[in-house]
Amino acid sequence: MKEFDLESYDYDLPKELIANYPILPKEKAKLLVYERRSQKITHTTFEHVLDFFPKNALVVLNDTKVIKARLFGSKHAFLPSKTTEVFFHRFFKNNTALTQIKGKIKVGDKIFFDAHYYAEVLELLHNGQRLIAFYGNKTPLNQENILKLLEQYGHMPLPPYIKRADESLDAHEYQSVFAKHMGAVAAPTASLHFSQNTLEKLLKDFKHAFLTLHVGAGTFLGVETKDIREHQIHTEVLRIPKKSQEILQKSQEVLCIGTTALRSVEYFKRLENPNQEAFECDIFLHLANPILHVNHLLTNFHLPKSSLLMLVSAMVGLEKTKEIYQIAIEKKYRFYSYGDGMLIL
């Protein structure tokens, strides 16, 4: 069936529609509103986004914070040029970290960030991942100090389709105004559309709940299996505070800010008796595993053959999604992380 065929999720996007910079002020970004019941499409801007939110809906937001996950160092302490890139993915046990390292590397290699700080390769894992430990003055760093190291020496992990180096503006624009808990290596991009003023109005006028899904580097990996149902999606760290859990359990109508919030809600609501706050989220939503517990979604326009495009198709239908995306292309909407948005009602 074509809805499970990977090629059905391909489309052509003119390169000039890939957003390399955000629209400022945020309210000027374009917004496509699609009402599923009437199939009506409205073209507006984020200045009016809250006008379309259903008054009784619970709005769910992901408050993860992007860390400066890209580090550059040298394999020799005395070399001033830093050409070896270390991409921090997530913490592992005993204060070690899962990373990707560009170029040839072997167990025991050290990568120096300055005269005091370096990383040592402990193990070569599958999928190109490397297990490393960080050191300061030859002493192993704990997670708190690793985060300080990343903040001091790291670069914002812009997506691979943004063909430029990170700049000073990315430190705050590739971060939602409600970002709180450090751990993501990619931004939950629908959240980037909210200015402080819009957020304050949302929190004042709507029921809301926060959760934390630390977006992993796997979010940029395309689906590669010919039958999308065979795809194994990446696992991400999820935390839902008890207060938010209670609100979610009572809510009948849910609007999620972004696919990460939606996946988190769907994962949580399918658990029989959740009795903890921390989870490992690995839910893959598509037409054979449809959305059951979320009614509305604010999202960006996603990459061809991506699991996120399949999620949108699970909500809207494959043909309607392709039709809407074609309209967005014709109307010159800007795509991907720094692009415009789409509200599905």
Could you say what each language-model-derived stretch is?
Residues 1-345:
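Surface-exposed, charge/polar-rich loops and edge strands
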